[in-house]
């Protein structure tokens, strides 16, 4: 990454008393399900404290990269805009809640595509709506179409873009983020829990995904056979 954040989350686990439950609970569910597709050698770009490593299968070889080791635990310290690996090195790549913090997301995704082997998988999540965080290294928010454009420009094939939450999650999470958590602390817990339960239920009953909190994208790098087919098709 191109930033040195002051605070990095060590775990995505949340309960209904957490003010960011509506975002993190949905994000965790989607990511843990998608991680079942990760195989071989996996690169975790912007790994932080490796919070998602626990859900990666034990037979997968894990490599975590981050630009800073003062508040993260990377395998390798390096900038994600110039990954220190040869092309076609990794079978899988993951990049969760990182792309909004890099000044040139096209370069980072191009680098991920470069080091993926043909047929390799990328799992990528970004927020669409979230308050300013890890300032001043907070540059972008992504719609599904912006995210799709960046990944397709790298040559990867986008297969799924899954919304995280919906309009009800958005309304509640925006409100909860503004509450005075530091001042009132645990005294807010009952109100936080009630808000989370009500709006989580509303989101399930009336699932409008036009205004989500974020997205999880799944993409693959074309295999050599697919590339040859495309060449013959275009001749």
Where are these regions (language model features)?
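Residue-level signal for short amphipathic helical patches enriched in basic/charged
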Residues: 37, 100, 142
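Residues lining the SAM
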Residues: 96-99, 125
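Conserved N-terminal segment of class I S-adenosyl-L-methionine
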Residues: 1-88, 92, 96, 106-109, ...
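Flexible loop residues that form catalytic
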Residues: 50, 98, 164-166
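S-adenosyl-L-methionine-dependent methyltransferase catalytic module, highlighting the catalytic core
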Residues: 5-9, 17, 21, 103-111, ...
């Amino acid at each position: 990454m191109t930033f040195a954040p002051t605070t990095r989350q060590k775990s995505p686990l949340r309960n209904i008393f957490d003010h960011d439950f509506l975002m993190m609970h949905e994000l965790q569910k989607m990511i843990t399900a998608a991680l079942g597709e990760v195989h071989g050698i996996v690169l975790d770009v912007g790994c932080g404290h490796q919070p998602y490593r626990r859900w990666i299968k034990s037979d997968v070889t894990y490599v975590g990269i981050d630009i800073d080791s003062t508040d993260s635990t990377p395998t390798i310290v390096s900038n994600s805009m110039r990954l220190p690996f040869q092309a076609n090195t990794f079978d899988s790549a993951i990049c969760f809640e990182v792309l909004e913090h890099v000044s040139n997301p096209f370069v980072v995704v191009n680098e991920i595509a470069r080091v993926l082997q043909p047929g390799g998988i990328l799992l990528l999540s970004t927020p669409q709506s979230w308050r300013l965080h890890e300032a001043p290294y907070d540059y972008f928010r992504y719609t599904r179409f912006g995210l799709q454009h960046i990944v397709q420009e790298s040559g990867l094939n986008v297969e799924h873009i899954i919304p995280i939450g919906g309009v009800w999650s958005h309304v509640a999470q925006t409100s909860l983020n503004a509450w005075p958590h530091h001042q009132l602390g645990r005294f807010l817990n009952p109100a936080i829990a009630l808000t989370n339960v009500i709006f989580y239920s509303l989101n399930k009953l009336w699932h409008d995904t036009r205004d989500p909190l974020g997205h999880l994208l799944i993409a693959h790098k074309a295999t050599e056979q697919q590339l040859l087919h495309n060449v013959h098709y275009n001749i």
